[in-house]
């Protein structure tokens, strides 16, 4: 039964436009990701950015979980990963960006896919060191550019086209046109179905909520849900 459902889901994904299918896959993956798997991916990117692909380069990327952002039971909503580009010879931090979980998963897929190709090319070269140096001479800068793109271009989670104007307390973002059309009939998030009980339960992107804002909101929702429990 489970296999049949999985096959049907994959069949639907195959019929979707590539960009939308990729988004659906990322949302599903972030939903099933465990905390241990998340930390493993952070460590894997650090390994690729220093010990493997960028081992002979002047610059490398360092990925760290922002202290305190993963301490909540709702860590998937509030966790942040800090990506820092560092000059190895001087130790100077040249750039730094903060990503949410969805953006991090996108970057993880991009980097691991690209790195596997670079490493495969290096392994078949007659002079692996020379090939690695030429192919990945600016790898840290290229990857940092991708981080900047992900964090600068927040897209609408519905149409995947318009720039996001609003962000809901669950951290999903939408353009005004799409969320207006959805909210005519529904009072929940189109992605995760989190209920919106008030008329103003959203933030404009320019006034995006802090991690504490989102965590407190979800904790309040949990307090109001269900029946009192007496151990």
From Swiss-Prot:
May be involved in spermatogenesis. It comes from Canis lupus familiaris (Dog). The keyword Hydrolase does not apply. GO terms for biological process: protein autoubiquitination. SUPFAM superfamilies: RING/U-box. It is found in: Membrane. A lipid is attached at residue 2 (N-myristoyl glycine). Its main location: membrane. It is a lipid-anchor. A zinc finger (RING-type) spans 156-193. This is RING finger protein 141. The keyword Zinc-finger applies. Keywords: Lipoprotein, Membrane, Metal-binding, Myristate, Zinc, Zinc-finger. It comes from the Eukaryota. InterPro entries: RING-HC_RNF141 (IPR043400), RNF141-like (IPR047126), Znf_RING (IPR001841), Znf_RING/FYVE/PHD (IPR013083), Znf_RING_CS (IPR017907). One of its GO terms (molecular function) is zinc ion binding. The lineage of its organism: Eukaryota, Metazoa, Chordata, Craniata, Vertebrata. GO terms for cellular component: membrane. The gene is RNF141. Pfam families: zf-RING_2 (PF13639).
């Amino acid at each position: 039964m489970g296999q049949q459902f999985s096959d049907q889901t994959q069949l639907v994904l195959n019929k979707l436009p590539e960009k939308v299918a990729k988004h659906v896959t990322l949302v599903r993956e972030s939903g099933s990701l465990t905390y241990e798997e998340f930390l493993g991916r952070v460590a894997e990117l650090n390994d690729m950015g220093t010990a493997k692909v960028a081992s002979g380069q002047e610059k490398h990327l360092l990925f760290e979980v922002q202290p305190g952002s993963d301490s909540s039971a709702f860590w998937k909503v509030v966790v942040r990963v800090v990506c820092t580009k560092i000059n190895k010879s001087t130790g100077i931090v040249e750039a730094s960006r903060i990503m949410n979980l969805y953006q991090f998963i996108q970057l993880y897929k991009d980097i691991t896919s690209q790195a596997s190709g670079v490493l495969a090319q290096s392994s078949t070269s007659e002079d692996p060191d020379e090939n690695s140096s030429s192919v990945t001479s600016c790898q840290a800068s290229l990857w940092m550019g991708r981080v900047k793109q992900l964090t600068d271009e927040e897209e609408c989670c519905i149409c995947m086209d318009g720039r996001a104007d609003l962000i809901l307390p669950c951290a999903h973002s939408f353009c005004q046109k799409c969320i207006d059309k959805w909210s005519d009939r529904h009072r929940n998030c189109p992605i995760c179905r989190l209920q919106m009980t008030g008329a103003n339960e959203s933030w404009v992107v320019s006034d995006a909520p802090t991690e504490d804002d989102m965590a407190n909101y979800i904790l309040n929702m949990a307090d109001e849900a269900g029946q009192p429990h007496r151990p």
